[in-house]
From Swiss-Prot:
<feature type="region of interest" description="Disordered">
    <location>
        <begin position="71"/>
        <end position="91"/>
    </location>
</feature>
<comment type="similarity">
    <text>Belongs to the OS-9 family.</text>
</comment>
<comment type="function">
    <text>Lectin involved in the quality control of the secretory pathway. As a member of the endoplasmic reticulum-associated degradation lumenal (ERAD-L) surveillance system, targets misfolded endoplasmic reticulum lumenal glycoproteins for degradation.</text>
</comment>
<feature type="binding site">
    <location>
        <position position="171"/>
    </location>
    <ligand>
        <name>a mannooligosaccharide derivative</name>
    </ligand>
</feature>
<feature type="binding site">
    <location>
        <position position="242"/>
    </location>
    <ligand>
        <name>a mannooligosaccharide derivative</name>
    </ligand>
</feature>
<keyword id="KW-0256">Endoplasmic reticulum</keyword>
<protein>
    <recommendedName>
        <fullName>Protein OS-9 homolog</fullName>
    </recommendedName>
</protein>
<feature type="region of interest" description="Disordered">
    <location>
        <begin position="329"/>
        <end position="349"/>
    </location>
</feature>
<dbReference type="GO" id="GO:0030970">
    <property type="term" value="P:retrograde protein transport, ER to cytosol"/>
</dbReference>
<feature type="binding site">
    <location>
        <position position="248"/>
    </location>
    <ligand>
        <name>a mannooligosaccharide derivative</name>
    </ligand>
</feature>
<keyword id="KW-0732">Signal</keyword>
<dbReference type="InterPro" id="IPR012913">
    <property type="entry name" value="OS9-like_dom"/>
</dbReference>
<dbReference type="InterPro" id="IPR045149">
    <property type="entry name" value="OS-9-like"/>
</dbReference>
<feature type="binding site">
    <location>
        <position position="270"/>
    </location>
    <ligand>
        <name>a mannooligosaccharide derivative</name>
    </ligand>
</feature>
<dbReference type="GO" id="GO:0030968">
    <property type="term" value="P:endoplasmic reticulum unfolded protein response"/>
</dbReference>
<feature type="disulfide bond">
    <location>
        <begin position="241"/>
        <end position="274"/>
    </location>
</feature>
<feature type="binding site">
    <location>
        <position position="276"/>
    </location>
    <ligand>
        <name>a mannooligosaccharide derivative</name>
    </ligand>
</feature>
């Protein structure tokens, strides 16, 4: 009688075999070679199964009580060598697995034993690998040369980062309002810190280039971590750190990410005080096979087929079907109970809506988007910084709010309507007051009232008069005398008109 143990059968193929790839902390070194048991959808008759079991080369009995592991390993190795000499394709051996009430025929792939290590071949391989690393470093840095004419940006909480010309990284606080599709702009009222701007050439590469009489090596080196290869550039010369008294430094890692459409900063962290690490994901390095991520290792499949008699019907391997049928019978019983108790329309327990805050989730009731039912949703006005553009360091002209022609041109006056003023976040009453003051101050000359956006998103109304300074001064003096006379007549104190230049500023920012 045969007995089958999947774990022992998998381990007997190559006892002590090592992982073919590099070291990975998440992998178990004792799991190689890897096997995976797969249950095939096809079936095999009992006659064919016993024929395969009897016709294969005798190796050892599945009853481990009658043989030792050492004898089984020696017999298996001898048979494998004899079979592999005449066969180019994979070879299998068959074992019977019993899982009452069924039996399965499992085909186990026979793996070749690893060859003995050759010291000379290993030394040649190491030398070839060193040359390949040097070539890959130069090739990878050449692929990244296009980054020297561009900038990458990354935002993380309070701080934002810019990586420009592939050699300078700046940390700054961005303005709170950034238009869609525009890079972050530094707030001029906050400080910025340079994390690195001077590439540091690896000492090993510089020494090797000097010994060989070659040109200066690229300011990057290739590093290997497990099966993954990536370029590393170290930047120095950053802003002096107030905690350590030394310059800030940063290490930039370039990783190949197949399928990406553009370069992107993955993340930035401060690993130690004023020492940073940044990862750049780029598809450029994928053009060199040396930087491609390793292929996922697949386990060797142990395929098991169900053994059947011709007269028996194949049972279903899907164990979820009876469970689903049992679950489907539960609401039916509840419906029957509800019908007996007189409930005309019992509700399915599995679809019972949940009441959250007075709202039935899943009830498919149309809810109002406003604060009160039956009213349209409220439209909030855009913030003041909504109209800001990418050039936030300078003033920006928005629109002419009101204008008046001189008396020679007819003296016509044009003012935006109340709807347009509200769209610009302006109060019509404030604009009306400003327009009246500008009309009186300009007199017979033409004038205009403009809306200007200041750095930071604030807006300001500015008035301009088409007159010389002498004429404007006379008009101001005349207007001043008229106001003084009116104040004396009424006995009230009124605000005097402040003398200024041709450009008039009105302190109405808070009322806009």
């Amino acid at each position: 009688m045969r007995r089958f143990n999947l774990i022992l059968l998998a381990s007997l193929q190559l006892v002590g075999a090592r992982s073919p790839g590099g070291f990975n902390i998440h992998e178990d070194l004792l799991t190689y070679p890897q096997f995976e048991v797969v249950f095939d959808n096809q079936y095999i008759s009992e006659k064919d199964a016993h024929s395969l079991l009897d016709s294969q080369h005798p190796t050892y009995s599945a009853d481990f009580a009658q043989s030792t592991l050492g004898q089984a390993r020696e017999a298996d190795a001898r048979d494998n060598e004899a079979e592999n000499k005449d066969q180019d394709g994979p070879s299998y051996k068959y074992e019977l697995m019993k899982m009452p009430p069924n039996e399965y025929l499992c085909s186990i792939p026979i793996l070749q034993s690893p060859e003995a290590e050759n010291k000379t071949a290993n030394e040649l391989a190491k030398a070839e690998e060193a040359r390949e690393l040097t070539r890959a470093t130069a090739s990878g840095w050449e692929l990244l040369s296009e980054l020297q004419d561009s900038c990458l940006y990354f935002m993380s909480g309070w701080w934002s980062y810019s990586f420009c010309n592939n050699r300078e990284i700046v940390q700054f606080h961005a303005l709170p309002s950034i238009p869609n599709g525009q890079p972050p702009k530094r707030d001029p009222h906050t400080m910025e810190f340079t994390l690195g701007r001077v590439p540091a050439v690896p000492a090993s590469a510089a020494h090797q280039a000097k010994m060989n009489g070659q040109e200066a090596p690229p300011p990057a080196e290739l590093q290997v971590k497990g099966d993954q290869r990536y370029l590393v550039q170290r930047l120095e010369g950053g802003t002096i750190c107030d905690l350590t008294g030394r310059e800030r430094t940063i290490e930039v890692q370039y990783h190949c990410v197949p399928g990406m459409k553009a370069d992107r900063i993955g993340w930035i962290k401060e690993v130690t005080i004023c020492a940073y690490l940044m990862v750049v994901n780029t598809p450029r390095l994928c053009n060199d096979v040396a930087f491609l991520p390793p292929e996922e290792t697949r386990a060797n499949p142990i395929t098991c087929k169900l053994i059947l008699d011709k007269l028996n019907e194949p049972p279903s391997l899907d164990q979820t079907v009876p469970l689903a049928q049992d679950e489907a019978q539960v609401p039916l019983k509840q419906e029957d109970t509800g019908a007996k108790s007189g409930d005309a329309a019992p509700r399915d327990v599995g679809k019972e809506p949940i009441n959250i805050g007075g709202v039935l989730v899943g009830a498919r009731n149309v809810l109002s988007g406003a604060d009160e039912a039956g009213k349209p949703p409220a439209k909030l006005p855009p913030p003041r910084s909504y109209f800001s553009n990418s050039n936030t360091d300078t003033e920006r002209f928005l629109k002419v709010v009101a204008s008046g022609k001189s008396k020679e041109d007819g003296g016509e006056m044009e003012v935006l309507g109340n709807e347009e003023l509200e769209k610009l976040d302006l109060k019509p009453s404030v604009v009306k007051d400003m327009t009246e003051r500008m009309r009186k101050l300009a007199g017979k000359y033409g004038w205009k009232l403009e809306l200007v956006e200041l750095p930071g998103g604030e807006k300001e109304l500015r008035g301009y008069i088409d007159a010389d300074e002498e004429e404007l001064a006379k008009n101001k003096a005349k207007l001043k005398k008229e106001k003084e006379a009116a104040a004396k007549a009424k006995g009230d104190d009124e605000e005097e008109v402040v003398e200024g230049s041709e450009e008039q500023f009105f302190d109405k920012k808070d009322e806009l």
